[in-house]
């Protein structure tokens, strides 16, 4: 109504879906960062992240490898978000763990989920690799991360800890 103050709540945490930075001059895409180089580069789009990014209205998908984005540049982008979903692979896992540390340095309260092949095959080891990883999703993650983004905002509007 005109002239009436209204409170509008976001439907979910502001979420960044991230295909993280790759290695310099390394090839990658389709959910992997290959430990090899070629004469030409080819990057598949981050298809796995498109569905959940499309479902949450206040989210963004950032495909870092084709942009040649560094971890520093990525952390600067991530500081504007409350929740980051990192699609990790086996070859890039340790680099992604270091990125998670950088994200927490920039914004300590940010929530970080790791998804993808590495956490699927090594869930316990992945979760124990760093305290900076808040949780992992072992299987199909698209609905799980959307549900977390929506429910966490309702359960912890002022921030807080999710046990698990």
Residue ranges of model-derived segments:
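Short glycine-rich His-centered loop
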Residues: 13-43
